[in-house]
């Protein structure tokens, strides 16, 4: 059985020093048997990143919609895993007010980082919590999941204005928090040919690895991917530039799409 110290040691071995701004997408099942279960995992993460900013997604897109248009930040459960639900209830953790793609944070400037999400009108609006990861020198750790769960790539597509990613018609939703409420007109993820856009993000897995934007690692029994947000943005922009919709329209992305990126990066490093 894994212990809290083992988890912290693994984070250190990944090259993380605890002062990072880091977003973690996770599968508790993939992590495996931990002494104390999910609470121990959270204890380890919160202790390790107490001098940084620890972020977990607390999405509600599965439940907050036309038939249930109210997002109560204090009550609405997350639809993206047990760790996210336990995390957002912990003392010192702040949850953003985005009605469908909220995020919870713990650590330095968490409230400041998460502020203003009730004014967003798309899932990962430019200038929002996801987009600003790249400007914060942020990392993304995928624990037991792949890039199909890497919400940050949605934000990259929004910044790049990739066509056919959002619904034309917004949905009226109401955000409720202890100090008030606000109506929001939210566009949703939508593509006429691919109902689950993020499933195609895995087509960029090799590109991210080859270009130094991501590296494979492990945490417990879980295969993990540690990403650099700014580099993920750059590589995605480079690959999509000639053909913005290629993730959906092509079965696979050929290596030629990023070979010149590696060449330019290597020349720059020299």
Spans of features found by a protein language model:
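Acidic/aromatic/glycine-rich contiguous surface patches that form carbohydrate-binding/processing clefts
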Residues: 190-269
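Glycine-rich phosphate/diphosphate-binding loops that line cofactor/substrate pockets in enzymes
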Residues: 12-21, 133-135
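A conditional alpha-helix N-cap/helix-loop micro-motif detector
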Residues: 4, 38, 122-123
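N-terminal active-site beta-alpha-beta segment that forms phosphate/nucleotide-binding
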Residues: 17-67
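Internal, conserved structured core segments that host functional sites
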Residues: 65-154
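Glycine-rich, aromatic-bearing surface loops/beta-hairpins
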Residues: 114-217
């Amino acid at each position: 059985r894994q212990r809290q110290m083992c988890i912290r040691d693994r984070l250190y071995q990944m090259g993380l020093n605890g002062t990072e701004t880091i977003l973690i997408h996770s599968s508790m099942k993939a992590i495996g048997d931990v002494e104390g279960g999910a609470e121990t995992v959270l204890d380890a993460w919160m202790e390790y990143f107490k001098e940084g900013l620890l972020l977990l997604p607390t999405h509600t897109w599965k439940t907050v919609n036309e038939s249930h248009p109210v997002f109560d930040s204090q009550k609405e459960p997350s639809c993206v895993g047990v760790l996210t639900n336990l995390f957002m209830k912990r003392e010192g953790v702040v949850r953003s007010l985005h009605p469908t793609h909220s995020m919870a944070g713990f650590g330095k400037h968490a409230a400041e980082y998460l502020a203003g999400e009730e004014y967003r009108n798309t899932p990962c609006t430019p200038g929002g919590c996801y987009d600003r990861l790249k400007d914060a020198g942020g990392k993304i750790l995928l624990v037991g999941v792949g890039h199909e769960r890497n919400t940050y790539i949605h934000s990259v597509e929004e910044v790049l204005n990739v066509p056919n990613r959002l619904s034309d018609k917004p949905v009226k939703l109401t955000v409720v928090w202890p100090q008030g409420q606000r109506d929001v007109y939210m566009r949703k993820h939508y593509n006429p040919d691919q109902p689950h856009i993020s499933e195609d993000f895995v087509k960029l897995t090799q590109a991210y690895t080859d270009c130094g934007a991501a590296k494979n690692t492990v945490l417990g029994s879980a295969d993990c991917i540690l990403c650099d947000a700014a580099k993920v943005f750059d590589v995605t922009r480079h690959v999509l530039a000639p053909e913005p919709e290629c993730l959906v329209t092509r079965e696979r992305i050929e290596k030629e799409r990023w070979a010149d990126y590696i060449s330019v990066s290597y020349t720059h490093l020299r």
